[in-house]
Amino acid sequence: RLPLNIGEFARVLGGGIVPGSIVLVGGDPGIGKSTLMLQVAMELARGGTVLYVSGEESERQIKMRALRLLRQNGGDTGAEAMPEGLLLVTETSLSVILEHISAVNPMLLVLDSIQTTYLPELESSAGSVTQVRECASRLRELAKSSGMAAFLIGHVTKEGAIAGPRVLEHIVDT
């Protein structure tokens, strides 16, 4: 397991992140999913390569949030404060994301969000049942074969269920 110093979150994961696991992180809009995942990414990037992919925010927005996290934790907020192993990418095409993964071989992928990610060869739009299922399935196969852990951030519906196909909940490990 990859150890985490984020107590309650590490406890939920059984003490840390299992290499090759795929975890779905869901919750209401604005509750802090992206911030929590950025905090995890920043911590792990101090010991290896972490790829944080956002289809929701610009690189500048992510960096501003990272600096806010560093300030809250009493850390250095200079340019050198960002962990060297943290790679930020703004992208929604899974084909391009897979190229980035292949190029840097991260120990952890954070994808924000699975509903904004799409495969160009499928005719349906991002967030559709087919797109969400296929993107999650391909990422699961990659995680299992490479040992890369992956966190998929997922939106929820007004009823509190993960948006997209119910099969998504069965594709992930946690």
Regions found by a protein language model. Give the residues of each.
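Loop/turn-to-beta-strand initiation segments
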Residues: 48-49, 85, 105-108, 146-152
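Conserved nucleotide-binding/hydrolysis micro-motifs of P-loop NTPases
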Residues: 29-31, 56-60, 92-96, 114-117, ...
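Flexible beta-alpha connector loops of hexameric P-loop NTPases
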Residues: 26, 82-91, 118-133, 160
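Gly-rich Lys/Arg/Thr-decorated short loops/hinges at beta-loop-alpha junctions or inter-strand turns
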Residues: 19-23, 112-122
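The Walker A/P-loop phosphate-binding site
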Residues: 1-69, 75, 98, 102
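Proline-aspartate-enriched helix->loop->beta-strand connector
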Residues: 99-111
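Phosphate-binding/switch region of NTP-binding enzymes
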Residues: 133, 137-174
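Intrinsically disordered, low-complexity terminal tails and inter-domain linkers enriched
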Residues: 72-82
